[in-house]
Amino acid sequence: MISGEQAKPLLITNVKPVAFGVEHSDATTDILVGKDGSISAIGKSLNAPADVERVDGKGAWISPGWVDLHVHIWHGGTDISIRPSECGAERGVTTLVDAGSAGEANFHGFREYIIEPSKERIKAFLNLGSIGLVACNRVPELRDIKDIDLDRILECYAANSEHIVGIKVRASHVITGSWGVTPVKLGKKIAKILKVPMMVHVGEPPALYDEVLEILGPGDVVTHCFNGKSGSSIMEDEDLFNLAERCSGEGIRLDIGHGGASFSFKVAEAAIERGLLPFSISTDLHGHSMNFPVWDLATTMSKLLSVNMPFENVIEAVTHNPASVIKLSMENRLSVGQRADFTIFDLVDADLEATDSNGDVSRLNRLFEPRYAVIGAEAITASRYIPRARKLVRHSHGYSWR
């Protein structure tokens, strides 16, 4: 069904599969999804029931449903989060991973009011700090050891292990002050106990990006990997670049996490030119970054494409790669009997001015344009975010355009 109420079979026609494996070519195909949301047939000119809903892909690409590994969607529970509907299916994203908006003290609310009602699949990294991002940066969640309750974190995970995929630590002096790298060490210990990955936000030192990488292990995630902040850019320090390159090769996941302050065109282009690609592309979408400069996942993907990240790698970075972090199987995703979970999109010629987190401007001449998110038997019409007129607003760091 197309954003409807009652489930009907869904016939998707004239789409080109990508990122489903070598057995699928560039030729177009049709996909029939049953009322129960599982794929019932794949091929050309399929016989479909009389009551079928039809979506004509018009030659668009179809991939596994896009995964955004870093968003903030505890709307109403934090002062920074947006609604899942603002960055999910209506933007072509079928899986959203909240990056530490909730801590152990309020995760139950996030589960009840955000995860359970949402049509998108929602997973979460649990914030190491008990309060999460209730009053983001105004009331930092990791000021000292009193902000961390190990026993309650373990209890929270035990009660919500189907939703929590890891531990999140923000390692930046804006949050931790002079506490440095200690929260990262504590977070890593807890992640080891729980046998889950840790995602670490790197930013204004301390802690140093170098120190963080030395603590992480295979499967862990460093988000904001291509930030342009002084003292935290991999392109201003050859030793740091070499360390990041080595850690990436050893299985530490470099995640974009664009956000309002954490992505640089110059850093990304230089790193990719030297062969260091991000493992995953994510937005760090929240109320202070959506309207400017991030917009959505499709635009963020387009930014990486513009700095010469290959098309196939861009798609992998929003499907298979982030899915592996949250233990979401992508095996045989386009097979009869599998639940339908797709993004239908075009890659179009464009001439769009886009800005990174440092204020540097680039023109995007190729754009990912989401058309539909397919979740079970429902095809939700999708599009990129169209920014509103910006205004100068005051916030925890001073003033900025939003």
UniProtKB/Swiss-Prot annotation:
Major enzyme class: hydrolase
Cofactor note: Binds 2 zinc ions per subunit. After heterologous expression, a stoichiometry of 1 zinc ion per subunit is observed.
Positions contributing to Zn(2+) 1 binding: 70, 72, 168, 284
InterPro entries, A to Z: Amidohydro-rel, Deacetylase_Atu3266-like, Metal-dep_hydrolase_composite, Metal_Hydrolase
GO terms of molecular function: carboxylic ester hydrolase activity; deacetylase activity; hydrolase activity, acting on carbon-nitrogen (but not peptide) bonds; metal ion binding
Record key words, sorted: Hydrolase, Metal-binding, Zinc
Binding of Zn(2+) 2, residues: 168, 201, 224
EC number: 3.1.1.-
Known cofactor(s): Zn(2+)
Gene3D superfamilies documented for this protein: Metal-dependent hydrolases (3.20.20.140), Urease, subunit C, domain 1 (2.30.40.10)
Post-translational modification N6-carboxylysine, affected residues: 168
Site for Transition state stabilizer, residues: 170
UniProt function note: Esterase that catalyzes the deacetylation of acetyl-(R)-mandelate (in vitro). Can also hydrolyze acetyl glycolate, but with lower efficiency. Has very low N-acetyl-D-amino acid deacetylase activity with N-acetyl-D-serine and N-acetyl-D-threonine (in vitro). Theoretical substrate docking studies suggest that other N-acetylated amino acids may optimally occupy the active site and may in fact be the physiological substrates.
PANTHER family: DIHYDROOROTASE-RELATED, IMIDAZOLONEPROPIONASE AND RELATED AMIDOHYDROLASES
Family: Belongs to the metallo-dependent hydrolases superfamily. Atu3266/EF_0837 deacetylase family.
Protein name: Deacetylase Oant_2987
